[in-house]
């Protein structure tokens, strides 16, 4: 691969963006970045704390800056936060600076993959399924709008999905 390309993974919570992203980066010899981990690194606090102290709006401001910074790099795989897609600025940066891969999954899989994860502030409610359905209604059309490639992640291992992405991108 003479030209260093960026691959940006978008999709809902529990789609496997971070896990698949790590495999993809390793297989393609690219740097891996996770926007949520970068926010935690810069703030010295976990995402739940940022949400508690700054609210979702404060978190989204940080997320927009982190994604802007990371998408300036070359030769990376970036796992974005599930809600980052709602920012027009982030959508524009992702579309302009790399290949956008939408990791699609079902609500059932999201529930199964996230039910014990206390680090997801939006799901710390009585009915996380209802929240996930509501988020999907708003976000799924945005994922589809900017995706160069759509890959289903439901019944496959992260490594298999990473291989499918490589195949679809012709790398």
Curated annotation (Swiss-Prot):
- Say yes or no: keyword Transferase present: yes
Summarize where ATP binds, as residue positions: 14-19, 120, 156
Q: Listed GO cellular component terms? A: cytosol
- Specify the enzyme's EC class, one word: transferase
| Function in brief | Catalyzes the specific phosphorylation of the 3-hydroxyl group of shikimic acid using ATP as a cosubstrate.
Q: Which HAMAP family match?
A: Shikimate_kinase
The name this protein carries in UniProt is: Shikimate kinase
């Amino acid at each position: 691969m003479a030209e260093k390309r960026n691959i940006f993974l978008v999709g809902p919570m529990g789609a496997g963006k971070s896990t698949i992203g790590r495999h993809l980066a390793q297989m393609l010899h690219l740097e891996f970045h996770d926007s949520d981990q970068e926010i935690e690194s810069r703030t010295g606090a976990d995402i739940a704390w940022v949400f508690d102290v700054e609210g979702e709006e404060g978190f989204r401001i940080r997320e927009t800056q982190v994604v802007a910074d990371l998408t300036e790099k070359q030769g990376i795989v970036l796992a974005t936060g599930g809600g980052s897609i709602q920012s027009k600025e982030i959508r524009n940066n992702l579309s302009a600076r790399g290949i956008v891969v939408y990791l699609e999954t079902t609500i059932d899989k999201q529930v199964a993959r996230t039910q014990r994860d206390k680090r997801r502030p939006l799901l710390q409610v009585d009915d996380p399924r209802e929240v996930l359905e509501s988020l999907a209604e708003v976000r799924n059309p945005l994922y589809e709008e900017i995706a160069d490639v759509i890959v289903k992640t439901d019944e496959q291992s992260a490594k298999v999905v990473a291989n499918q992405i490589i195949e679809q991108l012709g790398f």
